[in-house]
Amino acid sequence: MTQTFPKDFWEQAQTNIEFIATSYISGDIPFTAVKMLLFDDHKLLLTKVPRGWDIPTGHKEEGESIVETVKRETLEETGVTAKNVIFIGYLKLTQVVQNEQNKKYPPLSAIGVFICRDFTVSDFNKPLHEATERCFQEIDRIGEIHHYWPPIMESIMRYAYSKL
């Protein structure tokens, strides 16, 4: 049975979002960013960045693979070294209208989504990291502190947890 995921729409960026569950990293769509779902038992790693609590997320740098990006961003934001990361799919972003929020991105792009449960936690030194705090939050309580946890992300997290 194929799992279906809710769709989303980013109002400011005028962009439709849908999650494509796959283990294949396609070269047919440009990946511009990544998201990491890093689990420790029944808890998910969150990082406190200027917009609020979030999962480790970041943009791909020139010449970098998305696997390199997700490891780098996780380390930069949390001080956690992700070892064996697993690609579980991507958020497919389709611009409805080009505007100031989305003009630096292609009309069709992707955000790679990864999971990890093999990692090393180092000391968290705020000046060395992009975030001000990090925590492992019970997966049933993410919405209590996450700055924006829509149904699409809840369903992706549940799907990711089932893949461990």
What is the meaning of each model-derived region?
Residues 1-35:
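Acidic, metal-coordinating catalytic segment for phosphate/diphosphate chemistry
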Residues 33-35, 44, 131:
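Short glycine-rich loop/turn motifs
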Residues 36, 87, 114-116:
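A structural signal for short, well-ordered beta-strand segments
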Residues 39-77:
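Conserved Nudix-box catalytic region and its N-terminal flanking loop in Nudix hydrolases
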Residues 81-91:
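A short coil-to-beta-strand element that immediately follows conserved catalytic motifs
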Residues 91-123:
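Active-site-adjacent beta-strand/loop module that shapes the phosphate/pyrophosphate-binding cleft
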Residues 112-115, 124-156:
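NUDIX/MutT-family hydrolases
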Residues 155-164:
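Charge-rich, low-complexity intrinsically disordered segments
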